[in-house]
Every structure is written in structure tokens, then in C-alpha cells.
């Protein structure tokens, strides 16, 4: 089941690159940078996985009201309950791209790489 939750996505390797660029760029002094490559719903991640051969990815997007009811029986879902269905304010990484010359990987590329690594480790089949 794909729960209705959205979050900012960035590859940890891109975060590391941004840190290095910030240390090397004088214009970054005193600045803060949002590094989310984009915001994704869990159902979007499931679709990316499904489209790339990961057949066990969630197939059903659960409505908010169903997820909230299920939260009464699932501790992790209960913790996520306040965030279900909420659209995040879209944080842009434009500042990091402009000042640092930061070029993040696409979220699709990162998701597929992560899934392949998890598969290679034998954690999914």
C-alpha cells in the first residue's frame, strides 16, 4: 500500500557534493541551502520502482482517511498520521544550483540505484 505522504528527496551523495562545493565557494559564506531535488509522493516512488521492474512495489494508493484509520492499528502509520495527505511547500534547490553550481542526480536515477543496491544485498527479491 502506498500511503499518502510527500517528502523532499535528495541523494545523500548529492548532499555530500553540496557540502564540498559550499566549502570551496566564497559566495556560500553565511548562506543556507535547501537541497531537495524534488518533492515526491510515496505513490510516485512506487510507480518509478514498478516502471523499472520492481514488481513488489506498492500497487494501491491508499486514501488519507483509510491511512488514518489504519494508523490506529499500526504504530509507524500513527506517527506519520499528521503528515498524511499534506502537500509540502515546495522547497527549491535553485539557490544551491545558482551559487554552488550544484547539479543533483535525478530522483528517478537515485531511487532505482537504491533499489538495485538493496536487491543486491538480498534484502528484497
How does the language model describe each region?
Residues 5, 35, 57, 86, ...:
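Short, flexible active-site loop motifs that bind/organize anionic cofactors or intermediates
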Residues 18-78, 107-125:
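Mid/C-terminal beta-alpha module of Rossmann-like enzyme folds, strongest
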Amino acid at each position: 500500500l502506498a500511503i499518502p505522504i510527500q517528502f523532499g528527496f535528495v541523494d545523500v551523495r548529492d548532499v555530500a557534493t553540496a557540502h564540498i562545493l559550499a566549502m570551496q565557494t566564497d559566495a556560500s559564506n553565511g548562506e543556507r541551502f535547501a537541497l531537495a531535488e524534488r518533492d515526491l509522493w510515496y505513490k510516485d516512488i512506487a510507480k518509478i520502482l514498478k516502471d523499472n521492474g520492481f514488481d513488489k512495489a506498492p500497487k494501491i494508493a491508499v486514501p488519507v482517511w483509510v491511512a488514518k484509520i489504519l494508523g490506529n492499528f499500526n504504530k509507524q502509520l500513527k506517527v506519520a498520521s499528521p503528515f498524511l495527505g499534506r502537500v509540502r511547500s515546495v522547497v527549491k534547490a535553485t539557490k544551491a544550483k545558482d551559487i554552488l553550481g550544484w547539479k543533483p542526480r535525478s530522483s528517478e536515477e537515485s531511487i532505482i540505484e537504491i533499489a538495485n543496491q538493496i536487491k543486491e544485498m538480498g534484502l528484497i527479491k
